[in-house]
Design a protein with these regions (language model features):
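Helix-turn-helix/homeodomain-like alpha-helical modules used for DNA recognition
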Residues: 61-80
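DNA major-groove recognition helix of helix-turn-helix/homeodomain DNA-binding modules
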Residues: 46-63
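A short, Lys/Arg-rich alpha-helix, primarily the initiator
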Residues: 1-12
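Short alpha-helical DNA-recognition segment
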Residues: 17-34
């Protein structure tokens, strides 16, 4: 799982808008925006949240720490 803070941080690191994330992950922009309005772990469809996480990882994002206690995000530039 990933937290709302991690989603926002990953988007910022990649310079993506919510619409760009939605397009790349194959979900609606309304879904991304709805998730980002929440706190902690989004109350979300697991399949959709997994698609978002996997798309970030394809672009060099690594999610670190516990998403609720010490959420972290690292961008690996190798291969991009």
């Amino acid at each position: 799982m990933i937290s709302v803070c991690q989603i926002k941080a990953a988007r910022a690191m990649l310079g993506w808008s919510a619409v760009q994330l939605a397009e790349r992950a194959g979900v609606s922009s309304a879904t991304v925006k709805k998730y980002e309005m929440q706190i902690g772990i989004p109350n979300a469809n697991t399949r959709i949240l997994s698609a978002i996480k996997l798309k970030f990882e394809e672009f060099g994002i690594e999610f670190t720490g516990d998403p609720l206690v010490n959420p972290g995000v690292t961008l690996h530039l190798n291969g991009l």
